[in-house]
Amino acid sequence: MSLFGFLQRKPTAQVARNRLQILLAHERGLEGNADLAAILQEEIIAVIAKHVEIDREKVQVKLDRGSAFSTLEIDVEMPNGKKA
């Protein structure tokens, strides 16, 4: 293990993708949890707000459950150049 490898951060997109995959896999085992989309929306807003100033009303999370797979759709209106 090198010192330089320890100090490097993982790419944010990859970390977020891994978290969503884990969350969706877990969610598939918890059928009937209607509040999952609301919980996801609040957590996603919190993560984005750390880096960019956003309007919470302009973030939409849609979770569609199908028989074979579920889809998670996230719409975020990003401001022009405003940082948190």
Curated annotation (Swiss-Prot):
In Pfam terms, one family for this protein is MinE
- Matches recorded under SUPFAM superfamilies: Cell division protein MinE topological specificity domain
Keyword Secreted attached: no
GO BP field? cell division; regulation of division septum assembly
- Is Repeat there in the keyword field? no
What keywords sit in the KW lines? Cell cycle, Cell division
For this chain, the family text in UniProt reads: Belongs to the MinE family.
Q: Function, please? A: Prevents the cell division inhibition by proteins MinC and MinD at internal division sites while permitting inhibition at polar sites. This ensures cell division at the proper site by restricting the formation of a division septum at the midpoint of the long axis of the cell.
Q: Identify this protein by name.
A: Cell division topological specificity factor
What organism, scientifically named, is this protein from? Granulibacter bethesdensis (strain ATCC BAA-1260 / CGDNIH1)
